[in-house]
Amino acid sequence: MTNMSWSFLTRLLEEIHNHSTFVGKVWLTVLVVFRIVLTAVGGESIYSDEQTKFTCNTRQPGCDNVCYDAFAPLSHVRFWVFQIVVISTPSVMYLGYAVHRLARASQDERRRASRRRPSRRAPRPPLPLPPPPHPGWPEPADLGEEEPMLGLGEEDEDPGVAEGLGEDEEAEDTGAAKGAGGDTKVAGVPGPAGQHDGRRRIQREGLMRVYVAQLVARAAFEVAFLVGQYLLYGFEVRPFFACSRQPCPHVVDCFVSRPTEKTVFLLVMYVVSCLCLLLNLCEMAHLGLGNAQDAVRGRRPLPASPGPMPRPPPCALPAAPSGLACPPDYSLVVRTAEHARAQDQELASLALQALQDRRALGDLDSPPGPGLPANARGPPKPGAPASGSGSATSGGTVGGQGRQGIKPRMGSEKGSGSSSREGKTTVWI
């Protein structure tokens, strides 16, 4: 036992810290400190001379060996070493399964991520800008119409692409949380998920059933070894032992070295075994109560979380006249009656100004514009054809005749055309 190395078993048990609860970490501490260290350090020095110092009051050859075998069928130290190995076996098997499961899950996540990346749709190309207006056309005046919404903003992004990006980020976060070995605290997760307890992490990794199974196996082994230790050694080491086995000629008395020290050490190992069994039971109760609380919380209705602010309803544009259509990706904007009257008055004032300019230049023989009011027109010449009575409030008549004698501004403002302002396309009617 002096040359026995515990480094491999110790390193293996330390890996269990990464995938166990807080109570499981306490159990592992008790196992390493009070069992492995005590057995390796204290047991070797106490039981090193247990057979050499075991003497009997006879000189019969072989009687000492036969009586020692009857006193201790299995050495205390070897019994405790075997107990440590057997009780640690379920935890080691659980660790192997957990490592295999997590490695396989990470590989599956990488495959799914690689399949999702080529299937993403390319981002939409920007809409082509409309052609620039004619150099001679002025920019249309701001008549108060609402701007059409033609561009696709961030909120209109393809939901499939956004969903794929979100899944990739979630997979990367999950892989990073699983790859964090010794730290069971999930960074950035408030509440019970970010606490020191690793129960939620075991649930997230899908290892709860295997973890409970290894707890049950450990508890069963603890009970079995406690019963076996009592049947083999009892609760004390007697200072002498009466032996009547062959080849002893008669009943001989054999004496044990350091019986009190060995009795204390035996009782300490009893206490450690009972403590480990109690920790196993507490851990099973902790997992059961935690799962029950999660089930109760899951049945309760969740409080309404403050969501995003509701969007205001879109402003309804004036209805377009029946029979009018617009190309795709264009919005049809119709002027209101107030805007029409204001523009007609502006056209009338422009026509009156043009007539005054012609009179100043001496061109009095030309008939006035049909869009002028009645009081602004001169007396008609005899024999001249009667001009049509154009209404100043008729947008179509003024717009139709404004192309003949009025400036290009009137035609561009009244006629049906398209212009570009701030990169957005608007159809004016």
Curated annotation (Swiss-Prot):
Topological type in the membrane: Multi-pass membrane protein
Cytoplasmic side: 1-25, 100-214, 285-429
Chain intervals with Pro residues compositional bias: 124-138, 303-316
Keyword Acyltransferase attached: no
Modified residues (Phosphoserine): S366
Alphabetically ordered keywords of this record: Cell junction, Cell membrane, Gap junction, Membrane, Phosphoprotein, Transmembrane, Transmembrane helix
Intervals, Extracellular compartment: 47-78, 236-263
PANTHER family: CONNEXIN, GAP JUNCTION GAMMA-2 PROTEIN
Protein role: One gap junction consists of a cluster of closely packed pairs of transmembrane channels, the connexons, through which materials of low MW diffuse from one cell to a neighboring cell. May play a role in myelination in central and peripheral nervous systems.
Assembly description: A connexon is composed of a hexamer of connexins. Interacts with TJP1.
This protein's name: Gap junction gamma-2 protein
Origin species: Bos taurus (Bovine)
